[in-house]
């Protein structure tokens, strides 16, 4: 919801990270829904735990585990250090990495190194460029697209759909007309695959089908249950204006917790594979907090999971690699106890039941 204020994109990016680290911005009335599912125990796994590998394939490349370090930040001076450390971890574990929105890099070349740094620290793993729906709606030139791809030698482009965030953002862009047409134009122009993701409100099956028909190759449902970006932007708004009189008290509470749980989105979008539809990969994100969450997501049909908030907090506390190691151990334990020798078996056997 736009208003007459001035604030640079760089300042906004910095405040996003600060609020996510220090503020209470989690959904308060919605969970991911993953807790409603239970991985089914196999008393005869017939496996050697020590030989289990979490490796899998994503967009034609072998990766270390079905986990993406999801889009977080970039476009301000301190972001270079954060992105460099994220890239180092991605390289060590051979995990895909998504950068934050590259709008700032298109606006000001001085901020490009905060994104380019990732490829220097992660020369072999998959890295994905990122741009938002409001920028898409305005139309991106072929030069803009090429600049983003070349800047980080990207393996693909993430387009994030963030209508609720933009609604709450003080300087948000809420004209979402022609986004789908522009997505189709971009997929036709680019030689790399396009990922469409939400940012915490979820993607429904009908919207996923529209995106797939527009040429998108990967759907990241990014459902509710983790960070509420409405709350992040609300915190920015109240820091600046003191109170928020844009909505009624009751309406505000509902809107701050607006969204569809991650598990609900995942099950619905995965069901599209049962009907004629373009082939696609499926990512589960939104409140992923452990390797067990990853395992449940895979068992519900995801090809991989993705996490941003939990990994950002562990990076801030200096425990990112330790966190990733424990998550991989969680995942291998779940594979062992469900009798799944590979990630494909965990996905195809559906060893999961609803509580």
From Swiss-Prot:
Location(s), subcellular: Cytoplasm
Q: Where are the transmembrane segments?
A: none
Q: A single GO CC term, please? A: cytoplasm
InterPro entries xref list: Aldolase_TIM, FMN-dep_DH, IPdP_isomerase
Catalytic reaction(s) noted: isopentenyl diphosphate = dimethylallyl diphosphate
UniProt keyword terms in alphabetical order? Cytoplasm, Flavoprotein, FMN, Isomerase, Isoprene biosynthesis, Magnesium, Metal-binding, NADP
Q: GO MF annotations for this entry?
A: FMN binding; isopentenyl-diphosphate delta-isomerase activity; magnesium ion binding; NADPH binding; oxidoreductase activity
Positions binding FMN in this chain are 70-73, 101, 130, 197, 308-309
Cofactors named for this entry: FMN; NADPH; Mg(2+)
| Record-listed substrate binding positions | 12-13, 101-103, 165
Q: How does it assemble?
A: Homooctamer. Dimer of tetramers.
> Any idea what job this protein has?
Involved in the biosynthesis of isoprenoids. Catalyzes the 1,3-allylic rearrangement of the homoallylic substrate isopentenyl (IPP) to its allylic isomer, dimethylallyl diphosphate (DMAPP).
- The name of this protein is Isopentenyl-diphosphate delta-isomerase
Q: What is the lineage of its organism?
A: Bacteria, Pseudomonadati, Chlorobiota, Chlorobiia, Chlorobiales
């Amino acid at each position: 919801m736009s208003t007459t204020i001035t604030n640079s994109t760089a300042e906004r990016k910095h405040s996003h990270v600060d609020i996510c680290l220090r503020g209470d911005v989690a959904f308060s009335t919605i969970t991911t829904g993953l807790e409603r599912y239970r991985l089914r125990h196999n008393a005869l796994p017939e496996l050697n735990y020590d030989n289990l590998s979490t490796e899998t394939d994503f967009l034609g490349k072998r990766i270390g585990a079905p986990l993406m370090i999801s889009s977080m930040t970039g476009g301000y001076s301190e972001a270079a250090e954060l992105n460099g450390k994220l890239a180092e971890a991605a390289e060590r574990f051979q995990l895909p990495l998504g950068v934050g929105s590259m709008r700032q890099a298109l606006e000001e070349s001085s901020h490009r190194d905060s994104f380019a740094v990732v490829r220097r620290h992660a020369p072999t793993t998959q890295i994905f460029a990122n741009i938002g729906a409001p920028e898409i709606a305005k139309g991106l030139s072929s030069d803009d697209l090429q600049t983003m791809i070349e800047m980080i030698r990207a393996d693909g482009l993430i387009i994030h759909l963030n209508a609720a965030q933009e609604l709450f953002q003080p300087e948000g862009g809420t004209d979402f007309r022609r986004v789908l047409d522009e997505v189709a134009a971009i997929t036709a122009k680019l030689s790399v695959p396009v990922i469409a993701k939400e940012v915490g409100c979820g993607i429904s099956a009908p919207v996923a089908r529209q995106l797939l028909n527009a040429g998108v190759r990967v759907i990241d449902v990014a459902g509710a249950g983790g960070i509420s970006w409405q709350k992040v932007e609300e915190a920015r708004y109240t820091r600046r204006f003191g109170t928020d009189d844009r909505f009624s008290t009751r309406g505000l509470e509902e809107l701050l917790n607006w969204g569809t749980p991650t598990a609900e989105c995942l099950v619905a979008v995965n069901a599209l594979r049962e009907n004629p539809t373009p082939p696609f990969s499926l990512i589960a994100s939104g409140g992923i907090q452990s390797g067990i969450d990853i395992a449940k997501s895979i068992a519900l049909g995801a090809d991989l999971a993705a996490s941003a908030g939990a990994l950002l907090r562990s990076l801030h506390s200096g425990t990112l690699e330790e966190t990733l190691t424990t998550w991989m151990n969680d995942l291998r334990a779940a594979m062992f106890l469900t009798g799944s020798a590979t990630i494909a078996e965990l996905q195809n056997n559906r060893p999961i039941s609803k509580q």
